Regions:
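Solvent-exposed strand-loop boundary residues in beta-sheet-rich modules
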Residues: 99-101, 117
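Intrinsic-disorder/low-complexity, polar/charged segments enriched in Ser/Thr/Lys/Arg/Asp/Glu/Gln
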Residues: 2-9, 61, 75-77, 88-90, ...
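A structural microfeature
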Residues: 105-107, 122
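Short helix/strand-capping connector loops at secondary-structure junctions
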Residues: 108-118
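Hydrophobic beta-sheet segments that form the core/acyl-binding groove
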Residues: 64-98
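Hot-dog-fold acyl-thioester-processing enzymes
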Residues: 2-59, 116-141
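Ser/Thr-centric signal marking residues that sit
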Residues: 17, 80, 109
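Hydrophobic beta-strand positions
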Residues: 16, 95-96, 113
Length: 141
């Protein structure tokens, strides 16, 4: 089961580019996080509420596949969707340039539900209201 794509626009800042005048590769992972954070806010389970409830979602795997560079002042669209939401959570990403719809990067991150002691938890049991909000987001989209 996967959700629809959640989209957010971002303009490439000068500080995100390198000596080759393209976006430094690590910034794409930062943009993945921006997309993920905003998507979680839209599920009704924003990171702030998760953390206040003692639930953390650390990244345990990250992959990015580079297709074309982004450059200073490009307007990009960060697309994020949730594709797994059980013991592990998987988010998929696409970053495209708005002007020509060119795919710049795609990838994914995998996360684990853990408590403050970094011990794995079952979200369905630990926080059923949060689990149901995420499940509802998946099924309605």
């Amino acid at each position: 089961m996967e959700s629809k794509w959640h989209e957010i626009e971002l303009r490439v800042r000068y500080s995100e580019t390198d000596a080759m005048q393209v976006v430094y590769h690590a910034n794409y992972l930062n943009w993945f996080e921006i997309g993920r954070t905003e998507m979680m806010r839209n599920t009704g389970a924003p990171y702030r509420e998760l953390e206040e409830a003692g639930i953390l979602l650390p990244v345990i795997e990250a992959r990015a596949f580079y297709h074309s560079p982004a450059r200073y002042d490009d307007l990009i669209i960060i697309r994020t969707r949730l594709t797994e939401a059980r013991v592990k959570v998987k988010f998929e990403y696409e970053i495209v340039r708005q002007s020509d719809a060119q795919l710049l990067v795609n990838g994914y991150t995998v996360h684990a539900w853990v408590n403050r002691d970094m011990k794995p938890i079952q979200l369905r049991k630990a926080a059923p209201e949060i689990y149901n909000a995420i499940l509802g987001f998946l099924t309605e989209n």
